[in-house]
Amino acid sequence: MKQSSDHLSDVLAICRAERAVTARFFLSAPWALASEGVPGTMIRIGQGQPYWLQVRGQAPVQVMPGDLVLLPLGSPHVMASDLALPPISFSQMIERFAQGPKDENPLTFEHGGSGASSRIDSVLLWISAHCRHTILPLLPPLLHIPAQQASPPAILGHVLQTLIEDSLERRPGWRLAAMRLGELAMVHVLSNYFAAQQEREQGWVRGLADAQIATALAAIHGNPSHDWTLQTLAREAAMSRSRFAEKFKALVGASPMAYLLQQRMAHAAQQLESGLPLVQVAENCGYESERVFARAFKRWCGLPPRAYQRKSQALRKEFAALK
């Protein structure tokens, strides 16, 4: 069977949207809104008057019409016509305008004064646990893609506007379209970002720049539960075990087996979030003992598997309600 040469796609294939929340804001200067953070990946694109966006602890950026912004982990931020203005909490606006869960009733509102207006389209994605634990933490808290740098900008902007309009008009299939089109926009941004970083970053991003290591990385990401050994991974890379282990650690920053363990635990987190019983998750991840798996999982994320499962269920409810 012919192997893929597009290893970045192989790795990013785990980044799937499981739910989507959409919104459209009509904002007239002066205005300022503050978010304390949301449990998801936020994508926004605006039209009309430029506005400012500042992630907590970061320098502000001016967002021009057609620019795309992505907050991979939904970090706390302020967006405003003027950052000197005292912001109103997003949660207050949601309480005021939302009607039921937002994934059932997309949010739209008008806010501000009588000055120049901006329209901001927004989609919030609940991304698969495997991606949230392994891919998204590698990103900066804000990715800002100017309209002239998007490739191609017109199509990407049209995709986002289409998914917002479908959801606001409740067209048949809008929920699935919102998930898939939002996912498409996110993967487009991630692929461009990571492709530009391959020579600078350590970790799997840098590993993808090397054809042999990239093959092994794609194999791990594609099937983390497989009974991989150092020998079988070296064989995937067409290298000797010693040379493979040395080169993998130099590029990725972790040994092949340590990296494999990280991917398995992230894969386990995704299965726990789907509601699978602990014993089944342990077996799927190659553990004969539920107790041994539970210890390994707790070392990885700081929570026992059942506590993680309860927390993820609570976050899903928060994502849907956003109250």
Predicted regions and their residues:
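Generic protein-terminus/edge-of-domain signal
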Residues: 1-68, 74-112
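A hydrophobic/aromatic-rich effector-binding and dimerization subdomain
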Residues: 8-14, 76-162, 195-196
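Generic structural signal for secondary-structure transition and capping sites
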Residues: 17-20, 51, 168, 194, ...
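Amphipathic, well-ordered alpha-helical segments in soluble domains
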Residues: 18, 42-45, 155, 159, ...
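Generic structural signal for alpha-helix termini and adjacent loop/cap motifs
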Residues: 49, 82, 166-169, 192, ...
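Short, Lys/Arg-enriched, Trp-marked, Pro/Gly-tolerant hinge/linker segments that flank
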Residues: 143-154, 167-226, 230-237, 250-258, ...
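Terminal helix-turn-helix DNA-binding modules in bacterial transcription factors
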Residues: 215-222, 226-234, 239-240, 246-295, ...
